[in-house]
């Protein structure tokens, strides 16, 4: 396949592979290459000389593979309509000024290992491939342990990202759904099993990151309780074991909680630091997230 860019043979996570677009002039025809990120790659923005550029970056260790995507009948028909429109506009122009343009979509992917002949599934949903929390992402977490200086949590999901296929079982997989168990039950059972095995991403909410005011007087025990579902934002990758998270925003904090350390009923936020159970009327302190 002819293209205007020299691709690296081996890639590793974070390695730049190619820009999003490339051009080439061949026999008086402008060829525009549109590089599409495939499995094992991701489109990331970079700053270069004050300009924002988008480039395809590897997320796996393996061999770089690029192949041209075949156009569907609808795309070919649309291109034919665009070319006829351009020809009508260039009737008055001289033949030397008319330049033909061709757009080619190139799928760029990284295959694990070094097998160049290995085939990938083109119909796989790439949204499920890389769902790792990164800086700035909003995540849903569950509190697992408390101390005077911090709250330890486990990350359940990344907001605005699809949930991964749950190992072939449940509504999100290819297996049979158990009676009385829907998608929520299947997802909860899988996350519970992952939690027991210690396979979830872990995070830390430090006392100075709980809220933006009166940081020195924050009492973690009055803001969170074990079992609470907390909406937080990723501050940094942390110490290599735990993500550093923050709830120092009005829309961040506890979204679901139960009274009496999880033994009571579901509570609802009445203000930014108080939750109430509508059944018993019991109130407990929390750092609540603004619901809307």
Curated annotation (Swiss-Prot):
GO terms for cellular component: cytoplasm; cytoplasmic exosome (RNase complex); exosome (RNase complex); nuclear exosome (RNase complex); nucleolus; nucleus. InterPro entries: Csl4, CSL4_N, EXOSC1_C, NA-bd_OB-fold. Residues 67-98 are annotated as: Disordered. The modification Phosphoserine is found at residue 94. Signal peptide: none annotated. Keywords: Cytoplasm, Exosome, Nucleus, Phosphoprotein, RNA-binding, rRNA processing. GO terms for molecular function: RNA binding. One of its GO terms (biological process) is nuclear-transcribed mRNA catabolic process, non-stop decay. CDD domains: S1_CSL4 (cd05791). It is found in: Cytoplasm; Nucleus, Nucleolus. Pfam families: CSL4_N, EXOSC1. It comes from the Eukaryota. The keyword rRNA processing applies. Component of the RNA exosome complex. Specifically part of the catalytically inactive RNA exosome core complex (Exo-9) which may associate with the catalytic subunits RRP6 and DIS3 in cytoplasmic- and nuclear-specific RNA exosome complex forms. Exo-9 is formed by a hexameric base ring of RNase PH domain-containing subunits and a cap ring consisting of CSL4, RRP4 and RRP40. Non-catalytic component of the RNA exosome complex which has 3'->5' exoribonuclease activity and participates in a multitude of cellular RNA processing and degradation events. In the nucleus, the RNA exosome complex is involved in proper maturation of stable RNA species such as rRNA, snRNA and snoRNA, in the elimination of RNA processing by-products and non-coding 'pervasive' transcripts, such as antisense RNA species and cryptic unstable transcripts (CUTs), and of mRNAs with processing defects, thereby limiting or excluding their export to the cytoplasm. Belongs to the CSL4 family. Present with 5550 molecules/cell in log phase SD medium. PANTHER family: 3'-5' EXORIBONUCLEASE CSL4-RELATED (PTHR12686), EXOSOME COMPLEX COMPONENT CSL4 (PTHR12686:SF8). This is Exosome complex component CSL4. The gene is CSL4.
């Amino acid at each position: 396949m002819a293209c205007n860019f020299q691709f690296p043979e081996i890639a590793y996570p974070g390695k730049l592979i190619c820009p999003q677009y490339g051009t080439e002039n061949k026999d008086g025809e402008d060829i525009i290459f549109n590089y599409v990120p495939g499995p094992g790659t991701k489109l990331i923005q970079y700053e270069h000389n004050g300009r924002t550029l988008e480039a395809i970056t590897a997320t796996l260790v393996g061999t770089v593979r690029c192949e041209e995507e075949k156009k569907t009948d609808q795309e070919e028909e649309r291109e034919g309509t665009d070319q006829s429109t351009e020809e009508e506009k260039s009737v008055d122009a001289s033949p030397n000024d008319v330049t033909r343009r061709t757009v080619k979509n190139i799928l760029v992917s990284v295959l694990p290992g070094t097998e160049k002949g290995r085939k990938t599934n083109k119909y796989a949903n790439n949204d499920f491939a890389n769902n790792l929390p990164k800086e700035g992402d909003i995540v849903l977490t569950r509190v697992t342990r408390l101390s005077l200086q911090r709250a330890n949590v486990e990350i359940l999901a990344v907001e605005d990202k699809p949930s991964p296929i749950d190992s072939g079982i449940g509504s999100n997989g290819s297996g049979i759904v158990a009676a009385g168990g829907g998608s929520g039950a299947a997802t909860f059972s899988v996350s519970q099993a992952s939690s027991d095995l210690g396979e979830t991403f872990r995070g830390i909410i430090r006392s100075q990151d709980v809220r933006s005011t009166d940081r020195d007087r924050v009492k973690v025990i009055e803001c969170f309780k074990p079992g609470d579902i907390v909406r937080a934002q990723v501050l940094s990758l942390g110490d290599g074991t735990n993500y550093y998270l923050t709830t120092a925003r009005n829309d961040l904090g506890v979204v679901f909680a139960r009274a009496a350390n999880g033994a009571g009923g579901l509570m609802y936020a009445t203000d930014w630091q108080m939750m109430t159970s509508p059944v018993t009327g019991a109130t407990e302190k929390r750092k609540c997230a603004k619901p809307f």
